[in-house]
Amino acid sequence: ACAALQDVIAEHGAPKVVIHNVAELIIKPFEEGHVDDYQSTWRSMVQSAVLLAQVTFKPMVRAGGGAFIVSGATASLRGGARFSAFASAKFALRGLTQSLAREFQPAGVHVCHTILDGIIDTERSRELHSLDRAKMMRPEDIAEAYWQLAHQPRSTWTHELDLRPASESF
């Protein structure tokens, strides 16, 4: 995957916007979990962000900057019962994003962590949850928020943003 992305960058130039939107939701009691659950969530969510940043940041810096937006979750801020594998990876992803923001902001790369505090209206989530769709986050609305983040002037960069449906308690 890294080689393919490097080839795309070599052919088309540095990306202006990169979005890391990965979640592997493992829900089970801690005592039933296995270290493989943690390795899997960390590999899919944290390691993938590290690899994506390693491939894209250097070309973005050479090109004068860009935006790198990372999708977090409620679990980025607080863990819940039965969510330890998921929450540990989302916490780590938030910390990674904060570190990258501080390191690459001076070079013109806008790094932002978004907390998606709600259930996103997808086919899979509709199969798993019996929520009213009006109470779910619409992907196109999330995309609009990401577009706005990617186009912020350097004088007012957002480094963390909470997005949630109006029906979500917080």
Predicted regions mapped to residue ranges:
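Conserved amphipathic alpha-helix within the SDR
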Residues: 1-13
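Active-site loop of short-chain dehydrogenase/reductase
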Residues: 14-15, 29, 60-73, 106-109
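Substrate-binding pocket helix/loop in short-chain dehydrogenase/reductase
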Residues: 29-30, 37-42
